[in-house]
Amino acid sequence: MQTQLADFIRDTPEGREADSILRSCVHCGFCTATCPTYQLLGDELDGPRGRIYLIKSVLEGGAPTAKTQLHLDRCLTCRACETTCPSGVNYHRLLDIGREVVEDKVRRPLGQRLLRVALLAVMPRPALFAPLLRIGQLVRPLLPGPLRDKIPQRRAGDDQRPASRHPRRVVMLEGCVQPGIAPATNAAAARVLDALGISVISTPGAGCCGALRFHLNAQDGALADMKRNIDAWQPALAAGAEAVVSTASGCGAHLAAYGELLARDGEYADRARVVSDFNRDIAQVLAAEETALTALLEKTTAGRPRRRVAFHAPCTLQHGLRIRGLVERLLTAAGCELTPVADGHLCCGSAGTYSILQPDLSRQLRDNKLGALTAGAPALIATANIGCQAHLQSGGDTPVVHWIELIDEALAPAMNTTRSKT
């Protein structure tokens, strides 16, 4: 694709990056076949190729409009197009650059601005989000259906964690909304790691990974989140922690980008690369310990009936982190019978705050995904990202859990025996 960027961006780092990405696109259109919004709306401008043309026009000096902004807003950033693209177009980075420019040039209506301010004020702050969520859960039965669906039900679960007792240690990203919505998830991960001889150590000062602010075009706040985490984790990594582990693939995909996003920061560039290098999804950690894990699971699952489970692979897991088939293998080893899921590459519609900002499209995508997931009559739906988990649960009766909780449940007899001996 030939380009002629405007003076305002041509010689900037973002301009050079955007120019390189634009030139790698060959207009083939393969991306449209796997784009969820294009499949729903059938509009070229609501697919990756059309959005690339819109961004190119803006970066070449064209005046963006509210319609331009709408088409960019409708993108889920699911990155299925990147998996499909034969030319390796780094679409999500071009979208980040384009959205930031359009955000500066197009003033949003007051209602949109207030909603985004509220999201930025509450969701990245666990100390504020969790109590507000509890209040919402208390009054949830009294709310009208559409509003009630947006508030996840309170989930019972074991949130007890083992003490740090092993020489092998990892840091765990706790997240911002996950501790409030599903506190049992990280606790389950800590117990599974403990059974494998790995302790999770506390890192006070860490918080939101930065993805939420970043994708709402609050770039400065996102970078501040990232730097705070780097400062919190650096002492543990320097002292021998083996990884920064995340149980939410959306967070993990953002951690993987720390090195890239802070590459031009003289103070943090090197440390950001270290965090990205040490970033591991919990599935990757368990895969590295698969021999020991499988041996434990063989003891605890022998003779137990296999439970039918549908696995939803979040976009951030399969397209962002490029982890495919790994969780399914671990679940099978834990005694689960996986049911087939059609169109597994498509997004469920959660996409961070997308379900709040684009509720109609999000709901359609969720319902389509639930139809595919429940077609095999599973007893449970498992996933790997808190946003997907809450979003899918809001639309159906089949329980939706994080897959690590199923591993924890399968290992429970072995862990109880081990603890009784210590």
Annotate each PLM feature.
Residues 1-28:
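Generic N-terminal leader/targeting and pre-domain segments
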Residues 14-15, 91-422:
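Iron-sulfur cluster-binding electron-transfer modules in prokaryotic oxidoreductases
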Residues 19-38, 65, 69-89, 345-346:
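Cysteine-centered iron-sulfur cluster-binding motifs in ferredoxin-type domains/subunits
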Residues 24, 51, 71-74, 278, ...:
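Residue-level recognition of specific faces of alpha-helices
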Residues 29-33, 43-48, 200-204:
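N-terminal glycine-rich anion-binding loops that anchor highly charged ligand groups
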Residues 1-10, 37-70, 88-117, 401-407:
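Non-heme iron-sulfur electron-transfer modules
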Residues 30-33, 53, 70, 137, ...:
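Generic structural signal for well-ordered, non-membrane alpha-helices
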